[in-house]
Amino acid sequence: MDTLLSKNMNISNFTEYNLSHDAYATFDATTLKNLIIKRLNESGVFQDQNFEGSNINAFIDIVAYMYHVLLFYLNTTSSESTFTTATLYENINKLVSNINYKPIGRQTSLATISLSALSNLSPNLYTIPKLSYVTKNNTKYASVRDISFEKTNNDFERVAADNTTLYQGSPVEYPLYTATGEPFETVSIVNERPAPDRVLDNLDNIPFIADNSFTIFVRSIDTGVWREWKETSSLYLESSTGTRYEKRLNEYGNYEFKFGNGLNGKKLKEGDLVQIYYIVSDNIAGVVSANTLQGASFIVFTTPTYDQILADVYPDTTTFITPLNTENIVINNPSDATPVVPAESVADIRTNAPKMFSLQNRLVTRDDYESFVSKNFNNVVKSISVLSNDEHASQYLKYFYSIGLTKPNNNSRVLINQVNYSNSTQFNNVYIFAVPAQATILNERIPNYLNSAQKQLLLNECNLIKDITHNIVPSDPVYKAFNLGVNIINEVPCVELKDYTKLVIKRDTNIAINDVSIKNTVLKIFKQAFEDIKLGSIVDLTKISNNILNIPGVVGIATRRTDVNYEVPLISCVVWNPLYETSDIFCTSQNIQLSRFQFGYFYEISKLANSIVVETV
């Protein structure tokens, strides 16, 4: 019997695999089961595999199913092991840690404030210690940096320009940590919120730890004195005595703070105390409009540990604003607070990590500046573009000459930036044009610009890693307003064209579709198109037209004048500079390439539906 079985099972009785080179791509439980049955049939030894319910058939089912599951996990694991194919936040977070990329967590709202001192405050140099906060209508805004100012007289005095920024949220003192003395010792703050790609209901209403709001102090076991430690992009850039740490948002959504090993960054000794402070944001509920904080006074943050830290860190000559005289300082926020910005997603990390790796912790090229600002100031800046001094003169200033200005530097927006940020030698200037993330267009009509505090915030961070020869000049873009408009031959275009121009949507009378639905869809298409516009973008009227023509039932588009019997096919717009609407204005139905310093928006877009006419053909 054994001899017969051995003869029948001889390898020569089995066929070749005869699989195509891409057969692996179609393998699943069913194909594997069929392949096993086919090969058993070809061997001629077994027959029960052809009968469902037989023991061998059941065994084949188990093998095929196990193979199917294992293949699924193999494919998933293979995909998640590479940077370009990873889809899970935990995996891509780990992958980019190999190139020292640090994903950004959720960022809280920022408010720019002005500061005034009442007559009761005596003339002197004062410091409002960091973590002091104001509260209005149960909403808190705290400072993560010291605010210093000088009171020069006994009258009511505005003591600080609008260049102070507060972070929305409440200051928190994390439990004291005692160091163990290990090299590269790591302290973790467990975030109660999950990693960014995990879905929660009402995520916008859940408080969170605000990234970039951390302050760390260390008390030496040897001296018993508290000292502030600063964040660094990499400990490997630090000396053995550098009081620096690395911060990282890990794959679980928790913040890690890594200290040195005695060679790269100062090493914590056993018994050293580490105290971490941060801001817990109220999320979107804490975003306030302009003047909401008017009249609020600072409340000095105080705990036994923090009071001792202030005594150790600051010299005896420092005059602090204390709880006894905080009422003599009042603030106001002249502009809206910035929006809350979500943490970097998997797609954001995949886009930003290669760019930040190429920076190598320095700002030299145009791409370096644009990548750095876009990643680190996305709660302040919606769009950014960088021009060299040659480009500034040959493009930006030339634009003002082209619209009739004989002295472009006398333009108020140009002048204020030149005075505040430029130096007498301009050949090394780097001009950063930025569009604010919050309230980009006021009332859908008036262009908005970064305020002085936001520009200074951007400038401070860029100066830390910029090329030593560069002088950074934050600059204001040129805005281009768009609306429906068409002019007849030899007619001088004017802004008023928008008031008697209609967008005519022609729909098939045989298609059952509501006119209101068509108008709403067209409005949505326009809004999406202009929301995606950045500095230097193409305003693609052709794409907008095609998207409208793809609406079911729509068979044609025209732009029509209502004061004269005249219309043109597709979409025609009147385009103008709101600050020079008589000097820079034209009508076009072509796509428009904006210059790198120009930003386009649709003027009063919420009223567009009133200018849409639906006709049946």
Feature roles, as predicted:
Residues S132-V134, P207-E238:
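Extended low-complexity, serine/threonine- and proline-enriched intrinsically disordered segments
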Residues S234-D272:
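A surface-exposed beta-strand-loop module
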Residues Y141-R145, T241-L249, V386:
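Broad, structure-driven detector of short, well-ordered beta-strand segments within folded domains
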Residues T127-V134, K266-D282, I446-S452:
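Extended Gly/Ser/Thr-rich low-complexity repeat segments
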Residues M1-A210, F217:
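Extended assembly-interface regions of large multimeric machines
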Residues P334-V617:
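Acidic, low-complexity glycine/serine/threonine-rich segments
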Residues E157-D222, Y252, E256-F257, K266-L363, ...:
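Acidic, glycine-rich low-complexity/disordered segments
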